[in-house]
């Protein structure tokens, strides 16, 4: 990797910038009321990856470009306090651009912002936690705000919404009218 992309999970990551710029990794912390069982967490994570294929990607650098590539290896789960990867380029992450770790009653998901925004990763984490609770034997269900792992995946979920911005009426000039509106 060049000096333009130093993939660190510890807040020292800078994409196309220097140490004075913002980090490109975010963390979602989920606190549960019981201690986390890594066996159930690993199983829930494996099942969640089938519902969220858009985050099953890694990064490869060639010439002057960085390109996403599909990753199909198991997603590792790390216990906080034990040696963990500090870079997204660490081989222990199996090529993924996110890290899942836990400590007592807390679940941590660190991810590269090129992978998804907070809304997209929050949908993944909610589905992961719901499945974890189901595997743990709790009678939980969703009110519709959590994507079920059995739900259908739509291609638009993995697309950049900014690319569809031109289709929105608000991005058209004031004088623009749609003939179907009348």
Regions found by a protein language model. Give the residues of each.
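Flexible, P/S/T/G-rich "lid" or insertion loops adjacent to the active sites of thioester-utilizing
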Residues: 159-182
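Non-catalytic N-terminal regions of enzymes
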Residues: 1-161
